[in-house]
From Swiss-Prot:
GO terms for biological process: translation. GO terms for molecular function: rRNA binding; structural constituent of ribosome. GO terms for cellular component: cytosolic large ribosomal subunit. This is Large ribosomal subunit protein uL3. The gene is rplC. Pfam families: Ribosomal_L3. Belongs to the universal ribosomal protein uL3 family. Residues 119-145 are annotated as: Disordered. One of the primary rRNA binding proteins, it binds directly near the 3'-end of the 23S rRNA, where it nucleates assembly of the 50S subunit. It comes from the Bacteria.
């Protein structure tokens, strides 16, 4: 994150989101596919290489799919529904000028992985007394009943893997759009680590496009 100053001198914390090489690979229509959507690819993959075991290399189907759009195979491919399909053409680059300052957007990403964590950190549960003969401190309490249920109910909040989930932060404001460097400055923070992949959509609650 960084910060910029508004017109009135107010300090605004922003996240810099880079948006390069977004190419429309396919258009889907109600007549052919049953719904309207555009398929967008991001970040080039290496060309097909026989017997390549790394996923950095594209396979033959991926190369053929991208060739229809006269583009290189892409590492990330996503679909966006509820858009004006007629406003896009296959092979067209979707640039940052799709958004302008003041737009309200939803940002989706994969949250930071925290590894295996206890119930206190993972679910915000309270710990036990730390002194005076306490037999539990950060351990979880009762997780079920005795003979009546004779099992632990599904969904019980227990220790486990934390983070690494798909998270959407809604109603974030676009502070600035830099078309020269192809970056968007978003007010506040977005899900995921640095250099993580995020999807930016028009706000579903406060849509403006």
């Amino acid at each position: 994150m960084t910060q910029v100053f508004g017109e009135n001198g107010e300090l605004i914390p922003v996240t810099v989101v880079e948006a390069k090489e977004n190419v429309v690979l396919q258009k889907k229509t109600v007549e052919v596919d049953g719904y309207n959507a555009i398929q967008v690819g991001f970040e080039d993959k290496k060309a097909y290489k026989k017997d390549a075991k790394s996923n950095k290399y594209a396979n033959k189907p991926a190369e053929g799919h991208a060739k229809k759009a006269d583009a290189a195979p892409k590492r990330f491919i996503r679909e966006f529904r509820n858009v004006d399909v007629d406003a896009y053409e296959v092979g067209q680059e979707v640039s940052v000028d799709t958004f302008v300052a003041g737009d309200v957007i939803d940002v989706t990403g994969v949250s930071k992985g925290k590894g295996f964590q206890g119930a206190i950190k993972r679910h915000g549960q309270s710990r036990g007394p730390m002194s005076h003969g306490s037999h539990f401190h950060r351990a979880p309490g009762s997780v079920g009943m005795a003979s009546d249920a004779s099992r632990v109910f599904k969904g019980q909040k227990m220790p486990g893997r934390m983070g690494g989930n798909t998270v959407t932060v809604q109603n974030l404001e676009v502070v600035q759009v830099d078309t020269e460097n192809k970056v968007i400055l978003v007010k506040g923070n977005v899900p995921g680590p640095k250099k993580g992949l995020v999807e930016i959509r028009t706000s579903i609650k406060k849509g403006n496009k």
